[in-house]
């Protein structure tokens, strides 16, 4: 038997269930994309503020570069020769913005989530994770030595019971959640989680703000800023690769946690650092973050418009954010609906198992601030 036969059989099974993934060839045209010769409005991007598609901002940044600062590679890990001064500048700026002791930048959100929990956990650690946390967090949990219990999504009564029954049996308990959940677009009650955490001296709180940074909070710092609990979150994590139109992940935390991660976090230690030119762009965006409030407001308006329409048309839509699922159920039906919307000029993509549970395939509308209300109304007519 050919050693690839099992894999070929599994791929055929995925295709029969309409769950086979393929890489699309995409040409980006600002707010639009061209796929297979058809130009469509992009409703599947994480460019929530529309910054990646905004040419004047890129032009302003590029005009500030000179050959000495345009460094396309760090050529080393940060612990060797890759810790360029721009890293120090970004981490100092993040710490000031969040009013935290320190910050640490990572190569990606995946590196962040897959690396932090294994670094800070041992066999005397219990992780209590929301059932719907991102796959990168699940990978981090699996790589750790900790025991893990996943509580039902946003069910803090169950979480409280787990804390009551387990707090005395472990040296450390880490509650893990996202602030805005990537598939349903709903939110965690961070203040409630802080209240639960504060009842025990051995409980820490880990919050991934990947989908909230840039779009929530008066200064765009996320749901923790919006809910006024930044100071009470031990591991406050975010990414630059979504609303901030750059690359990388970060944590704002105590100096002790930062120093510990530098010494123990394998996905930080054993990787080449980000290129300095990318970090310069990140710093440029962070300096402008406070000026994007009008984009945050516009995103809020169009998100509310589409959410109301989905509910009126009978779709279960738990979202309270700019991520709006239209749950259809069957994978094949979802693919057909996505194809229909694409033929009408909207690049909306199906999300299928294993990304979401069987029977909950959906079209995930990922809105950006440069979409107009008229375009949303045209979309509504088609759904």
Locate each region found by the language model.
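Active-site PLP attachment segment
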Residues: 219, 225-260
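Active-site phosphate-binding strand-loop segment of PLP-dependent enzymes
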Residues: 149, 153-207
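Conserved N-terminal alpha-helix of the aminotransferase class I/II PLP-enzyme fold
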Residues: 59, 63-109, 303
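Conserved PLP-binding catalytic core of the aspartate aminotransferase-like
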Residues: 297-304, 311-345, 367-369
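Structural motif of enzymes handling amino- and sulfur-group chemistry
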Residues: 273-292, 298, 302, 311
């Amino acid at each position: 038997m050919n050693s690839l036969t099992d894999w070929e059989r599994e791929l055929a099974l995925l295709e029969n269930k309409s769950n086979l993934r393929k890489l699309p060839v995409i040409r980006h045209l600002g707010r639009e994309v061209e796929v297979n010769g058809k130009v469509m409005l992009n409703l599947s991007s994480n460019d929530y503020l529309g910054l990646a598609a905004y040419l004047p901002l890129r032009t302003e940044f590029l005009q500030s570069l000179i050959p000495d600062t345009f460094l396309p590679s760090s050529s080393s890990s940060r612990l060797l020769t890759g810790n360029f001064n721009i890293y120090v500048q970004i981490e100092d700026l993040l710490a000031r913005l969040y009013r935290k002791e320190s910050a640490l930048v990572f190569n990606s959100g995946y590196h962040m989530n897959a690396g932090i929990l294994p670094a800070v956990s041992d066999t005397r650690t219990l992780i209590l994770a929301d059932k719907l946390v991102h796959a990168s967090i699940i990978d981090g949990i699996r790589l750790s030595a900790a025991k893990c219990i996943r509580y039902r999504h946003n069910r803090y009564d169950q979480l409280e019971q787990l804390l009551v029954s387990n707090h005395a049996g472990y040296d450390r308990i880490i509650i893990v959640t996202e602030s805005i959940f990537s598939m349903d677009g709903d939110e965690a009650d961070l203040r409630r989680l802080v209240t639960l955490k504060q009842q025990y001296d051995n409980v820490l709180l880990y919050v991934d703000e990947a989908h909230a940074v840039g779009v929530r909070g008066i200064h765009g710092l996320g749901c923790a800023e919006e809910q006024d609990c930044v100071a009470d979150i031990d591991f406050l994590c975010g990414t630059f690769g979504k609303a901030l139109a750059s690359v990388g992940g970060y944590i704002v935390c105590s100096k002790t946690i930062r120093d510990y991660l530098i010494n123990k976090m394998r996905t930080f230690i054993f990787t080449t650092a980000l290129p300095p030119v990318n970090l310069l762009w990140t710093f440029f965006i962070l300096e402008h973050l406070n000026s994007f409030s009008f984009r945050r407001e516009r995103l809020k308006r169009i998100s509310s418009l589409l959410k109301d329409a989905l509910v009126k048309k009978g779709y279960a839509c738990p979202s309270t954010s700019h991520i709006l699922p239209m749950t259809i159920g069957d994978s094949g039906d979802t693919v057909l609906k996505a194809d229909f919307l694409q033929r009408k000029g909207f690049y909306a993509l199906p999300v299928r198992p294993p990304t979401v549970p069987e029977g909950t395939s959906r079209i995930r509308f990922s809105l950006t601030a440069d979409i107009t209300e008229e375009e949303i109304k045209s979309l509504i007519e088609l759904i």
